């Protein structure tokens, strides 16, 4: 009787689920018409900008290509490449035609790309020239044609296809179909039901093997209309898209929500190092920043921590009234560094370091932390920055339901389970995995462990798959220990593993900082890490004591959302 009791506890804020009334495809038809002359997409560092009208015209050209090739609704089209205007255009051309888009992260290895393209049964592939050069044509025999994300030219066509010939005559085809020119009145996309699958999102997750998440128009509309209702972005505002668009988080808000409301999207198109990002923020001056903890934590560690750790600063921060003035100066400096115009910074995709969260809250920096997963396209919970509770992962959305698999969901950690508008249809061609991830009564098992409060705020403790059970029966969440260790001197990344019933910390040191200070010697490194281990064990419980720190030679391999692929390191032996 546990689950019905839990449901009663949350009945006061859960709404009944019903199909999102706004049609996902029509959101973009309406946006193109209403924002025809406004700037839509700009590739960072380039002069060219597509207006909403020009994007609609490019989509019309691709639709003519699809029609020429007798592409059917429900056929799959893969896209792999960096964030660019044409990436966005290819995505929207696919879904507004009624085909299913299959975005692939550009840092996936060729064998993974082959697997996804083949498993999804993709007909066409849009990609960059250099990525195509590294793929094996013979391994992708199901593809009819491949198109460049640089200029949409045909890079490859299967024997017997005449795609290249049609592409050369595209202007003539446009004149034939739109003899008076292409205008907003010519946009009339098929109103495909929101129930239809429109996206297959493959992710390696933390189990090491990709599953194709079937996302419907309703799932996408749920995320986008939530962004519209809460006014995350408005017509004429600006965003900088630097998270990979093939990942659900960046795609939903930097791209899909932004395009639905008439926002100007600048696509970074390069690796978002802190130096590149700061320059781009200064130039673009975005009205909203969507990011992951890794970016914010690097800014904190490289910019803020050295400042507040100075002896004079520590002294000043202990003086009443003066501390508030200093915090205000730090806040202003940070806001200015990020462009100065944003309403808030939304952080998601992985766990945030509690020390960083507490400091940002203390200086009243406008940030919030959301929670989601690919299977929810991705949003589960969010609260605006002025309502955000430090330590939480936001408040459950009004179009979602949540329950905790626990006898006392307010106080005792249990698995977080959700249902609602954003929850996927299942895994493509994988009924077994679909059955495993849903409960018998239809709730999605997130695999995350946490609690919830009376107002619907979610508090995440860790992953059920990573939790370690101590010898005395205590639950150990390695992420909580790692967050403390990562704040210590010269620790760039860490990973807690269990070895012979003891906890061991794998650490990738900050060699760059060690080199700059002339401290990169085995003796110095051992001294620093011994001190870190001693200080770490003072901060954790008796059952969480770490037996040793073992240095790791390279950065840890990560998933698309920048979580460490833990399964690769569980069997790491002693040095």
Question: Language-model segments: which ranges?
Answer:
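AMP-dependent adenylate-forming
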Residues: 27-51, 548
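Conserved pre-ATP/AMP-binding loop-to-beta segment of ANL
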Residues: 36-37, 167-202, 209, 232-238
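Conserved AMP-binding/adenylate-forming core of the ANL superfamily
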Residues: 40-84, 88, 92, 109-114, ...
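Structural core segment of the AMP-binding/adenylate-forming
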Residues: 69, 96-175, 501
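AMP-binding/adenylate-forming catalytic core of the ANL superfamily
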Residues: 108, 125, 420, 425-426, ...
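Conserved ATP-binding/catalytic segment of the ANL
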Residues: 396, 403, 410-411, 415-470
